[in-house]
Regions:
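Local beta-strand N-terminus motif with an aromatic residue
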Residues: 91, 146-147, 173
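Conserved N-terminal segment of class I S-adenosyl-L-methionine
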Residues: 1-138, 142, 165, 182, ...
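Short catalytic micro-motifs in class I SAM-dependent methyltransferases
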Residues: 153-157
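A short, conserved alpha-helix within the catalytic core of class I
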Residues: 158-167
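Conserved beta-strand signature within the Rossmann-like core of class I S-adenosyl-L-methionine
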Residues: 174-182
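A conserved beta-strand element that flanks and buttresses the S-adenosyl-L-methionine
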Residues: 150
Length: 231
C-alpha cells in the first residue's frame, strides 16, 4: 500500500469513525484478519505493552516483522516529504536514522551525498551508502558528525522519544530533519506507533524551547520538522 493511500485510510479511521467504534473489538478483528494476519502476535497488544519493551525486544519484533510481513512499499515517506527533504539538505555528509529498506539513503547517495544509515534491521543491499546496525538511542558517532541528520517515521516507535531526540541532536552539525505521522491515539491501528501527534501544537513540547537552534514545522500530510543549529 502506498503511503498516500495509507494516509487516507488512517484519516478515515481516526476522524470519521466514532471513538466507541474506533476502539472496538469489531475493528480489532477486522485488522487482525485483513491487515495484521500472520504478524498479529507481535501487534495485537503492542500499544498496551510498548513502553515496557527494551531495545532488544523491539529489535526482535521488527526483525520478525520483516520476515513475516514483508512490504512491497519502498518507503513510508510520501512524495511531498521526499521532495521537501531533497530541497532541505545542508552540506554533503548525511545520516539517516531509521532507514528501513534504504530507499531514501539510496536516493541521497545517487545524488552525490556521502550517506550513512542506521537501523535495527539490515537492508537487502547497500550499494551506495554505509550501513550501521544500531539504535537511535545510542548512535555510534562523535558529536556533530553529520551536516544533516534525517529521521523519518522512526521517533513514534521509540519508548524514550526525548532521549532519542537528544541523541539525534548530538550528532547533528547543521540541520536536523524529522518526519512524524499525523495520527490520533487509538488502541488499534495499522502500525506499531507509541507516540501520536494529531495537532501541530503537540510537537512543541517534544522539541522544546532552545536558545541555540531554530525549529519550523510544516503539514505535508505528515509533520515535516526542521531544526537548525545557530552558531
Amino acid at each position: 500500500m502506498k503511503r498516500a493511500s495509507e494516509l487516507k485510510i488512517v484519516s478515515l479511521l481516526d476522524n470519521y469513525l466514532p471513538p466507541k467504534i474506533r476502539d472496538s473489538v469489531i475493528l480489532q478483528t477486522l485488522l487482525e484478519n485483513y491487515v495484521w494476519k500472520n504478524s498479529r502476535k507481535h501487534v495485537i497488544d503492542f500499544r498496551l505493552k510498548s513502553f515496557d519493551y527494551t531495545d532488544s525486544d523491539l529489535e526482535e519484533i521488527y526483525e520478525n516483522l520483516a520476515i513475516e510481513r514483508p512490504s512491497n512499499r519502498p518507503t513510508d515517506l510520501n512524495q511531498t516529504c521526499i521532495n521537501e527533504i531533497l530541497q532541505s539538505l545542508h552540506g554533503e555528509t548525511i545520516l539517516e536514522v531509521g532507514s528501513g529498506r534504504g530507499y531514501l539513503s539510496e536516493l541521497l547517495s545517487s545524488r552525490g551525498k556521502s550517506v550513512t544509515s542506521v537501523d535495527y534491521v539490515e537492508p537487502h543491499s547497500t550499494p551506495g551508502y554505509q550501513f550501521v546496525k544500531g539504535s537511535v538511542n545510542s548512535l555510534p558517532f562523535e558529536d556533530a558528525s553529520f551536516d544533516t541528520v534525517v529521521c523519518a517515521h522512526t521517533l513514534e516507535h521509540v519508548p524514550d522519544i526525548h532521549g532519542a531526540l537528544d541523541e539525534l541532536r548530538r550528532v547533528t552539525k547543521s540541520r536536523l530533519i524529522i518526519v512524524l505521522p499525523r495520527e490520533r491515539p487509538y488502541r488499534w491501528g495499522l502500525n506499531l506507533h507509541m507516540h501520536f501527534f494529531p495537532y501541530m501544537w503537540m510537537l512543541k513540547p517534544l522539541f522544546g524551547q532552545r536558545t541555540h537552534s531554530s525549529t519550523s514545522f510544516k503539514d505535508l500530510g505528515d509533520w515535516f520538522c526542521v531544526e537548525d543549529k545557530i552558531r
